[in-house]
Amino acid sequence: MTALVLWGLLLLLGQHTQVNSHVLGRPFSASDSSQLKSLLERLEETISEADQEQNPELDQEVEYDIRDQDPGQRWNLDLGRDQDQVTATRSEIHSRPSVQRSHLQDLLMSLRKRASSCFGARMDRIGNASGLGCNNGRG
């Protein structure tokens, strides 16, 4: 009788290790998601610092141009066009980190989605309905 119980426990232990051995079989822990978020924040800071280091002359040129002209020339239409071009250039520069941030957030969300599936959403629905599939937790 004890041998049967021991064999049963050994079998359950073996199944438990097989289910948890695959990366997709394990759910995301809170520490994993917090580490990804902190990594995302550090990357955003690094990107913004790198953009500021690469293009400090752009900010200086705009200030220099405005200071060198007298107040009468500031209202000149040509200067207004130049400022529009500088503003457009600035918006392009500042849009890069936001685009990169959105890509990183998409990556973070896809990792969360991918952690619960093995073959995709449709196959998961089929697997859940039929009892087949890799993450159904059965047998």
Curated annotation (Swiss-Prot):
Major localization class: secreted
Compartment annotation: Secreted
InterPro entries assigned to the protein according to its UniProt record, in alphabetical order: Natr_peptide, Natr_peptide_CS, Natriuretic_peptide
A Gene Ontology molecular function term of the record: hormone receptor binding
Keywords associated with the record: Cleavage on pair of basic residues, Disulfide bond, Hormone, Secreted, Signal, Vasoactive
Presence of the UniProt keyword Methyltransferase in the record: no
Disulfide bonds: C118-C134
Signal peptide interval: 1-21
GO biological process: blood vessel diameter maintenance; cGMP biosynthetic process; cGMP-mediated signaling; negative regulation of systemic arterial blood pressure; neuropeptide signaling pathway; receptor guanylyl cyclase signaling pathway
Keyword Disulfide bond among UniProt keywords: yes
Proregion span(s): 22-114
Annotated Gene Ontology cellular component terms: cytoplasm; extracellular space
Family: Belongs to the natriuretic peptide family.
Function: Hormone playing a key role in cardiovascular homeostasis through regulation of natriuresis, diuresis, and vasodilation. Has a cGMP-stimulating activity.
Entry protein name: Natriuretic peptides A
